[in-house]
Amino acid sequence: MHQVIQLKILDSRIGDTIPLPAYATDGSAGLDLRVCISEPMQVAPQQTVLLPTGIAIYIADPKLAAVILPRSGLGHKNGIVLGNLVGLIDSDYQGELKISCWNRSQEHFTVNPGDRIAQLVFIPVVQTSFEVVNEFTESSRGEGGFGSSGRY
């Protein structure tokens, strides 16, 4: 499935010295998002910073949303993850995409202009409504919570 999403360039470096979001491989699920800053930025241990991407998107289709996810290598090797863990982009949002970057390590981390810092994945959305009931139809699990369906 392929869908076209509107993208607005907010900084003239996008598409020039800083590439547009792109899939790294044919099998990539996420588009790489890059930092749109003018000079290197130090992120101190345990510090959270909000990084601009220089782009805005408009999904428009209410049956589609996007999530901003961390890049696995940055998290595993450098302790760089998203400050909000996952960023949700609603279909009607039109503002700049920004990345909440949290350095959970004990070392300073340098973010350079154009660095790939997160990834954008588009996901289907099902909007629902609720039916208020007094009792649920019985299920095999019932009210079993944490750990009730197996060891892990």
Curated annotation (Swiss-Prot):
The keyword Protein biosynthesis does not apply. It catalyses: dUTP + H2O = dUMP + diphosphate + H(+). GO terms for biological process: dUMP biosynthetic process; dUTP catabolic process. Pathway: Pyrimidine metabolism; dUMP biosynthesis; dUMP from dCTP (dUTP route): step 2/2. The keyword Hydrolase applies. Its cofactor is Mg(2+). Its EC number is 3.6.1.23. Substrate binds at R71, S72, G73, N84, L88, I89, D90, K98. Keywords: Hydrolase, Magnesium, Metal-binding, Nucleotide metabolism. It is an enzyme of class 3 (hydrolase). GO terms for molecular function: dUTP diphosphatase activity; magnesium ion binding. InterPro entries: dUTPase, dUTPase-like, dUTPase-like_sf, dUTPase_trimeric. Pfam families: dUTPase. This enzyme is involved in nucleotide metabolism: it produces dUMP, the immediate precursor of thymidine nucleotides and it decreases the intracellular concentration of dUTP so that uracil cannot be incorporated into DNA. Belongs to the dUTPase family. This is Deoxyuridine 5'-triphosphate nucleotidohydrolase. It comes from Legionella pneumophila (strain Paris). The gene is dut.
